[in-house]
A protein has these predicted regions:
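Repeat-mediated protein-protein interaction surfaces in helical alpha-solenoids
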Residues: 1, 23-28
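Defense-system signaling and execution modules centered on TIR/cGAS-STING-like, death/scaffold domains
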Residues: 1-3, 12
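Terminal, low-structured helical/coil segments at or just beyond the last alpha-helical repeat
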Residues: 2, 105-119
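Short helix-capping/linker turns of helical repeat alpha-solenoids
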Residues: 4-5, 16-17, 21, 34-38, ...
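Hydrophobic face of amphipathic alpha-helices that form TPR/SEL1-like repeat modules
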Residues: 9-18, 43-50, 79-86, 115-119
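Alpha-helical solenoid scaffolds that mediate protein-protein interactions
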Residues: 32, 68, 104-105, 119
Length: 119
C-alpha cells in the first residue's frame, strides 16, 4: 500500500468535517499532523478549540496550533495568536500574540494583517 499523502489526509478530514463526522475528521487530521502537515495540525487544533469530536481542551488546541505554526501554517499561527491575546489555553501574552499574528500575516493570512493594523 502506498504511503498516505498528508494533503490527501487533510482533504479527507475536511470532507468528514463538512459532513459533521468530527470523529472521522480527527483521525485523518491526526495522521496528517503526524506526517508534519501544518494543515492537519491546525485542523486538529480547531477541533480541540471548539470541542468537535473531542472534549474541548484549549491547552491541546494551543499545542496543535503551535506545531501547525512551526510548519508555517498561517491559520495555525493566527489561531495561536488569538489564544495568546485572550489567554485561552495559554497564559495571556500580548507580545506573543503580536508575534504569531505577524507570522500569520507574512504567511498570507489576511485577517491577521487587519488585526495588527487595529492594534
Amino acid at each position: 500500500m502506498a504511503k498516505p499523502n498528508p494533503e490527501e489526509l487533510v482533504d479527507l478530514g475536511m470532507l468528514s468535517y463538512d459532513k459533521q463526522d468530527f470523529s472521522k475528521a480527527r483521525k485523518y487530521f491526526e495522521k496528517a499532523c503526524g506526517l508534519n502537515n501544518g494543515g492537519g495540525c491546525g485542523s486538529l487544533g480547531m477541533l480541540y478549540e471548539y470541542g468537535q469530536g473531542v472534549e474541548k481542551n484549549l491547552t491541546k488546541a494551543a499545542q496543535f496550533y503551535s506545531k501547525a505554526c512551526d510548519l508555517n501554517n498561517s491559520v495555525g499561527c493566527g489561531s495561536l495568536g488569538m489564544l495568546y491575546e485572550y489567554g485561552q489555553g495559554v497564559e495571556k501574552n500580548l507580545t506573543k500574540a503580536a508575534y504569531f499574528y505577524s507570522k500569520a500575516c507574512k504567511l498570507g493570512f489576511q485577517k491577521t494583517c487587519e488585526i495588527l493594523k487595529e492594534k
